[in-house]
């Protein structure tokens, strides 16, 4: 089960709102003004979708929950003099999320989408995986969530309903053809070829006398760049298999040919070599060691599963966008608070 939609609805992520194309601000490119809505009574209706109202209180609770979540979890830093602007941003996001969710839930009701216990269990397992990056449990999610436990649990249920709706109407209709796979494979190969050509140019500079360590610090995409590309000392069998042959045959100080590993394209330089010492009656054998530096430019991994997964995600997002736009066109949507918001 994919929980992208669920989590997006719950947390009001920009992904969901941009994916569904809702809540566009006509004045996004216009000069900002000081015309912001003043606080209203809790029951004041700020938006309507198919007769379902969004009150100021519910909008504000969700918006301030989003703001709190971004500050505490995503470490959003909001200067004091920009706090009101931030609140307005999250109020608009709150309205957009309400529109997306309400349109989808209305259609789910029309199609009589219902949850089974297995849906909830699958959803909780998927949520648990999603939350690992936050070091949260599912209970943390519900109890520490930005809108209170009761609302978070209801939002989770609603998100599962929406996922089930989208599975029936979008995901199960996805088709990935040989041409899709061939096109993406060709695009990725072209990207990797560009990386190879770039490293060829860097290698030429090294052959012309550029300092290896300085170049590594400036261009290498590996952690070792901080140390001028130095990887340390190795014996045979203790390094990447693709490194071993050149590392133990390359002359000390020479700039080696470009080699490819699962990480990308590399240029190697052996900076020191210590010959092997045979065993004696009083001491064990000491194996040959090399000290190695490299420059890495990363490539895009190309494998069938990764490619098909990428195509599936792209087609799914496009499918959700089209599906939502069709539903939205039939819906009665009105934003009473921000007249510049269109749906």
Locations of regions flagged by a protein language model:
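C-terminal motif of bacterial Sec signal peptides marking the signal peptidase cleavage site
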Residues: 18-21
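Proteostasis/folding factors centered on peptidyl-prolyl cis-trans isomerases
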Residues: 139-187, 211, 217-222, 242-299
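Bacterial N-terminal signal peptides that target proteins for export
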Residues: 1-9
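Peptidyl-prolyl cis-trans isomerase
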Residues: 77-86, 196-245, 260-261, 271-291, ...
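N-terminal targeting/tethering segments
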Residues: 23-24, 32-155, 311, 315-318, ...
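Envelope-exposed proteins and targeting segments
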Residues: 41-50, 55, 109-111, 211, ...
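Soluble non-cytosolic domains of exported or imported proteins
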Residues: 53-57, 81-102, 114-121, 147-160, ...
